[in-house]
Amino acid sequence: MENNAPRRVDRRTAYTKNTVKDAMLELLAEMPFEKITVAALCRRADIVRTTFYLHYDSLTDVIKELADDAVLAASGTGSKNIKDLSILAREMNKSTDPELLAPYMSLLPVCQRVADDPKYKVMFRDTMVSDYILMQIYRSQKSDSIRQFQDHLGISGQQAEKLFLFVITGAFEVNKSMGWEKKQDWYEVQKVLLTFISGGYEKLEQYFAK
């Protein structure tokens, strides 16, 4: 009889991989990714090279898995509805006080919230590593976002894909330029950007509804 029960997670494997990923985050806080070596990572994780290569083919694989983890953590909370950006824009036009806006921060898309987790923040300060995160956000959010753009705006799949690419890369680069810190000037900038984006959505809806 075939056993269709899910396979039990190998705890030793999970522990080892988490140890390697934590060691990578520690090293990223000390040096650029391009200067990190397998030997240095193994020393920090207290494992031998054979163990490392049992789980990963390269250092890049560790980064990609960390990027997956960061995006997954951000995707588990908050809104996925593009309409909610209009709500946030309205609130920001009332006030840019961080305390007053705190209840609405979950309305931000993943590309805006992904660096909020202190555990992964160090990854965003390395240009090479942050590019992997952007690619992972794009891959993980692409299908759902394109569908929403098509449903709400009545545009083609190609138009929806390019609009999503424009929004996500723009938001990501603005956050990168501001050091991924949500200080007062970040709220002022976001007020302008979200008002611009939500206004564009509304105009597109009106245009294609004709």
Task: Describe each model-derived feature in a short phrase.
Residues M1-E30, K35-A40, R44, V48-K210:
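Alpha-helical bundle regulatory/interaction domains
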